[in-house]
Amino acid sequence: MSGTRYLQGYLPSNGAVGTRIRIAGSKGILTIKSAVKGISRAEFEYEIPLDDAKIMLHTLCSKPLISKIRYKIEHSGLTWEIDIFDGENAGLTMAEVELENEEQHVTLPDWIGKEVTGKMRYYNSRLVNYPFTKWTDEEKKGL
């Protein structure tokens, strides 16, 4: 199974709106996200020139950048995205599935660990300021 390398960063934010610059494989992507409401948020995503994405990542985004490999796995009719982080977030692996609505039933694969939905420290935008390698043992256990 092959994954896609992601390198992403976040522009400084006022907290209500987040702006992410990402390189996914060989594509540049600009994403604008609203604040979270429940388990959902408004999200707008646009492909941008790869060279522009590289410049924005290295000159405009907060550091450290988020580096990970994403794998996609099908389970019970849904596509799970599995992110294996490296760099400042080495050791962290997260799984996510996109739902059609908040009430949609999900059959969890037996390889899923602890539920972290809504736990802010797991947001990629938060991992920039407080990377996984700096977490305490208690935080890594999910307490």
Residue ranges with predicted function:
Residues 1-143:
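Phosphate-end processing signature that detects enzymes handling 5′-triphosphorylated RNA
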